[in-house]
Amino acid sequence: MRKLKFICQLLIAFIIASLGYNIFYEPHQETVRAAVRQQFNQAGGAGQEAGGQLKITMLDVGHGDAILLSTAGRNVMIDTGDSRNLAQLEAGLARAQVKRVHTVFVTHHHEDHMGNTLKVAGKYGVSRIYDSGYPNARAANSVRLNQVLRAGNYNNRVLRAGDTVYLGKNYYVEVLSPDASLSRELAANLNNTSLVMLLHYGSFTMLFMGDAEKEIEGLLAEKYGARLKADILKVGHHGSRTSSIYRLTSRVKPAYALISCGPFELYHHPNKNVVGSLRHLGARVLTTADNGSITVLTDGKSFSVETER
């Protein structure tokens, strides 16, 4: 009888432990926390191991941004490109053998960044969409996306500076901009409403600037200083002269500067002075116009960069 009682107690303990595991440990659930930290590297600094290899692909989608982050069968996108270039986006995702996109970050509501978001959400089973919450009233795709998100679909959350989105083991993004106190004057330029995010994967870091322009870059340089240091910089506003001030880039000091842009004749991106300044800092500058899709591979300790051409 005692033996039977002991077995029953073990069984009950096992059931309780299993329930606790399922309730409190959700390895694929993303969480957002208002981060109150003195240093960015407290949760993912040097020596931190990540969960396997992270593959970051800046897809060649012509003029626009569409960046794919893949690890352990889980896919995240930062922007989805222009709706006019949907075929290029889908071809890039097909080459990457993407069947599902779990999460999308919309940096801001310009067509060349968010134009395919709802199409991606519908086709690839997106479960969560983050954005900065500033719609473009003059663009139908933005108006529609804003309506869908503000209605609470796709587990939407508006992000602000200080938020942290955890994506996996020692794998998270820190939101640096827009600040909750962003002025109406600055927000009138949608580029300045861009989500600026610092990605951490183990000790590897990559700074995504969206289309943030000089005014925002100056504020970031003043607020964060040397904490902006990153291995790779996703250059702001396609390498336009409106962005990439030395005050910011000299704090980032990237080994690589990646630019997503279409043919030079279209918008004259990237600006030659911007490219020259980045090279002066020691960065190797790559563009999707010249190099095709650009892929970064990292295990959280070291990284490599490959190009399509």
PLM feature spans:
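Non-globular, low-confidence helical/coil segments that flank catalytic cores
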Residues: 2-309
